[in-house]
């Protein structure tokens, strides 16, 4: 580790998020919803998918889901503000559609449309809340960066997990867990975002000078409503990336079975559950986050 705080790079980082919203409509068949959402007033742009005035994009994703992508921000506070704006745009869109139906039929629909930041629907299909971080191209993404940051991703649910109810395998009763999207994740990393369902997508599209920058595209995290949880998601991940970019060793925190550890941590709201590191030490999610916070504090 480095002893001088000035050795760790400090400064703004470009980051952004993308959210595929789930729309609940109990007035019509679910399978024709995408076509009707496409006609919402919020989509009446000159060209579907163009940028909005605040630099964001609101469009229909390849999976037919309405998606809001924030503009590029220079820090976690900017992402929080941009996500809140996105929530208001989506909410205004569904409210406009409800009013349009009432005007057309002369009778208000019995049940209003509702938009949710929900990543797994009742059929078990997953949607995405994606995080994007611009990082310096100093090390190999798959061989160095992913192993170093995975323990952070697997344990950060203690402060940024959205939570979910899952049936207990023993008695079938619903149990509260700390994560939602994580139950549908199949690998820590992959270049195939839809078939392998990775926590990190290896697609490297920095949209910047590619010899200097790369993009970390995180697809396995949860979506949050609470501003502090959104901020913590991006601020903590950016801080850990600073450690990695500066060459600080995090190998003692690498987990033996990352996805298993994530689910073990998430299944215990008391935060006492442990998982084994590659060095044979049993650690809790809180142990990992405390160790990362200590190293950030020592070096920033």
Go through each PLM region and give its residues.
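Terminal catalytic/cofactor-binding subdomain
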Residues: 1-116, 145-162, 166-167, 190-201, ...
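Short, solvent-exposed loop/turn segments at secondary-structure junctions
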Residues: 73-75, 120-122, 138, 183-185, ...
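A short alpha->loop->secondary-structure connector
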Residues: 140-143
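Extended, Lys/Arg-enriched charged tracts that mediate electrostatic binding to polyanionic substrates
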Residues: 136, 175-187
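Histidine-centered divalent-metal-coordination microenvironment in nucleic-acid enzymes
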Residues: 119-136
